[in-house]
Amino acid sequence: MLSKIKDSINSLRGITEKKLEKKDGTKYIMFGGKGGVGKTTMSAATGVYLAEKGLKVVIVSTDPAHSLRDIFEQEFGHEPTKVKGYDNLYVVEIDPQKAMEEYKEKLKAQIEENPFLGEMLEDQLEMAALSPGTDESAAFDVFLKYMDSNEFDVVIFDTAPTGHTLRFLGMPEVMDKYMTKLIKLRKQMSGFMKMMKKLLPFGGKDEDIDYDKMLEELEKMKERIVRARNILSDPERTAFRLVVIPEEMSILESERAMKALQKYGIPIDAVIVNQLIPEDVQCDFCRARRELQLKRLEMIKEKFGDKVIAYVPLLRTEAKGIETLKQIAKILYGEEEKEEQKIEQKVGQ
């Protein structure tokens, strides 16, 4: 399992190992940021790193544009699939269409005993399939499944670009409010129907409807949502890591994301700066770009200075295959610190 922490807590490896040392249930690590900054690469490299440590890990992609299959060079699906070469590393690429079908079937099963509401809610579900945000709702139901499970030591979420992710992570609050209103409605309806059964001759037609059971199911759903929200806001079990590139648009979008995540109570413990041009480049264009990047690093330090900041250089090759991911993991988790130390020295000048 994991060795004792030897490095400083002010490193990505340090905060990761500290979080994993405490055996209080499954841990959750999320990677987010602007599109194209390397979220999937960091998710995959982290999965490989933790699997190499002996942990049972699943990487769950909530991004409809799945890239994990390209990085690992194998096909994945809606259910956990082992990564080739590992018995303890799995990948799930959530299929929005399948997730929506499962979501609808689950809701239909819960309302089939209530003919009064059944037709109305079924029409509502069909309309929901065409509504904006449905992907997030359906994916969130799959997300809840992994939040409820103790099958894995670590669940890594490879999230969609920032806007989608913020809507997705706002689901617990939205659904909690919705469930609270629905429970209130069911309680009112239960009392009303019981009164009607006593007053009207046709009131007995709903005698097969078990309102108490329906209410119990709603309460269970609400408890599940609240539990997920509590885990998401627990810094002992959950960490959100922003991935940025040293460009102004990426930095500003990540700053906005950080503020929104803080509003939801989701702990951000690190910022990963990706695609840094190495110091030893020879061409004038590359050196000029590196100087610009160093200025942007000052901006990153200013905006995210209270977070752990890790640095990953621009690679000479594509981020594909297990061996490349192992190399990225070594850089990311502090086993190759020379470039990071040089960057820190430059930024500090």
From Swiss-Prot:
Top-rank EC class of the record's enzyme: translocase
Keywords in alphabetical order: Arsenical resistance, ATP-binding, Nucleotide-binding, Translocase
Coiled coil ranges: none
Gene Ontology MF annotations: ATP binding; ATP hydrolysis activity; ATPase-coupled arsenite transmembrane transporter activity; identical protein binding
UniProt-listed CDD domains: ArsA
Reactions that this protein is recorded to catalyse: arsenite(in) + ATP + H2O = arsenite(out) + ADP + phosphate + H(+)
Residues the entry annotates as binding ATP: 33-40
EC numbers: 7.3.2.7
Transmembrane regions: none
Gene3D superfamilies (alphabetical): P-loop containing nucleotide triphosphate hydrolases (3.40.50.300)
Described function: Anion-transporting ATPase. Catalyzes the extrusion of arsenite.
Family named by the database record: Belongs to the arsA ATPase family.
Identification of the protein by name: Putative arsenical pump-driving ATPase
Species this chain originates from: Methanocaldococcus jannaschii (strain ATCC 43067 / DSM 2661 / JAL-1 / JCM 10045 / NBRC 100440) (Methanococcus jannaschii)
